[in-house]
Each structure stands twice: as C-alpha cells, then as structure tokens.
C-alpha cells in the first residue's frame, strides 16, 4: 500500500488531511541482504533453519534503525533446504541462502560498491561460525540488496517487510485491505492487515477471499 498511495495513484484529491499525515509519517521495516549460494561441501549437521546472533545484537539493531549504517557484527538467518529435501543440491553438495537485516534505502548506502564487500563479510562470519570452510567451497552464488526490493518488487525505500509492526502501525492502524480512500481498491501483502511474513501475507489473501465471496455471492462464510 505505501508505494501505491505515494507513487502509483497520481490524483490524490481524495486523500484527507489525516490520511496524508498517515502515509507521510510511516516508519518502514529494515532492508534485507539475501545471499544465495551452493557449496561443494555438504554440511550434514546444519539444520533446515538456523538463526545466528552476533555478539553486539542491540548495537546491530541500533545501526539498522537509528544510525542507518552497515554493521561488521551481523546477525543472520540461514536456510538450508537440502536438509529436508536432498533434491535441492547434487549428491555430496549443499544449497543455502542467508538473510541479513540491513538498513533500508533511507540510509543512502551505495550497494553497487558495498554489495561485494558485504557479501565477503557475510561469508567470513559464516565461515567462523555455522559453516566452517565455506569460503573455499562456494559455487553458483548471487545476492539481493534493498535495491532489488525497491526496483523489482516496488517496496518503498527497499524495505523488506513494508511498514514496521509497531503499535501505531498495527491492527486497525495498519493499511486496510479495503482502501480507506479509493473506491474498489483492495490490498493483500506485507503492508496491509494483518501483517508481514508468510502467515500474515496469506492471511491477508484469506481476508479478501472471504470478503469477495460475500460480496459477489451475497452469502456469509465461516
């Protein structure tokens, strides 16, 4: 919804004062650095899902949301699909992606120059912790930065999860599934009710499925 209301709808005469204040004062979620890679080495002891916390976790969050700079002591989520589906990688090899919270594009970080350096940092951190030896075993890798989220996925400021889920932007205060100001405009996704993440996004689709079922067929659903 934020990108639609701010950039895609050209005529904004239906926006009242309070709605304009709402869309202009929103706080946005972190950005994401997502690194996909294969490995010539298999890591059988690594689970499907792993969360690794850096030593200065609170400082990392402060750099993301307040200072809007990159941290050299990162926390990350590591996904190993081949742990439960062996077809995700050739025999004796492995497949991963690692997701690292970073500042969104309000930071003005130049990812064209910082991307490779940050990838090397991520590799070093994994090599020192969960995936020893990974630096010498990476194959077929690529990464996504907040620029991808902003340019390809049209998320405002390259945020990974749309608006922040703080109290003043949650529940009724979140963008509604049925637009408050534009007739026949409806939303599903991370920025609308009930919230971000796969469960929230799918739930937003279920909300509209129920709504349209009642609207089109004039019947109540359970």
Q: Which functions belong to the PLM regions below?
A:
Residues 213-222:
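Active-site-proximal substrate-binding core of FAD-dependent oxidoreductases
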Residues 86-93, 176-181:
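Short glycine/proline-enriched loop/turn "hinge" motifs that connect secondary-structure elements
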Residues 190-212:
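A conserved FAD-binding loop/helix module that cradles the flavin
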Residues 73-77, 132-194:
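A glycine-rich dinucleotide-binding beta-alpha-beta segment and adjacent secondary-structure elements
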Residues 42, 69-71, 111-151:
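Flavin-binding catalytic cores
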Residues 1-89:
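Mid-domain catalytic core of redox enzymes
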Residues 37, 98, 126, 185, ...:
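Hydrophobic, well-ordered secondary-structure elements that form the walls
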Residues 2-7, 38-40, 90-125:
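Conserved FAD/dinucleotide-binding core of flavoprotein oxidoreductases
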């Amino acid at each position: 919804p934020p990108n639609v209301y701010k950039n895609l709808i050209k005529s904004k005469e239906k926006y009242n004062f309070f709605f304009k204040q709402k869309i202009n004062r929103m706080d946005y979620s972190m950005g994401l650095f997502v690194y996909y890679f294969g490995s010539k080495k298999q890591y059988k002891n690594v689970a499907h899902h792993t969360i690794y916390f850096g030593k200065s976790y609170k400082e990392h969050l402060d750099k993301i949301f307040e200072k809007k700079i990159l941290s050299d002591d990162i926390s990350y989520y590591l996904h190993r699909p081949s742990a439960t589906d062996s077809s995700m990688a050739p025999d004796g090899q492995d497949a991963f992606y690692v997701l690292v919270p970073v500042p969104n594009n309000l930071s003005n970080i130049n990812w064209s120059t910082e991307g490779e350096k940050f990838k090397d940092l991520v590799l070093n951190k994994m090599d020192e912790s969960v995936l020893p030896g990974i630096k010498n075993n990476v194959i077929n890798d690529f990464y996504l930065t907040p620029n991808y989220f902003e340019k390809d996925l049209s998320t405002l400021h390259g945020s990974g999860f749309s608006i922040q889920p703080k109290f003043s932007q949650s529940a009724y205060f979140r963008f509604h599934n049925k637009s408050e100001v534009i007739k026949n405009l409806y939303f599903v996704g991370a920025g609308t009710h009930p919230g971000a993440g796969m469960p929230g996004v799918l739930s937003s689709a279920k909300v509209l499925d129920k709504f349209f079922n009642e609207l089109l067929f004039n019947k109540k659903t359970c």
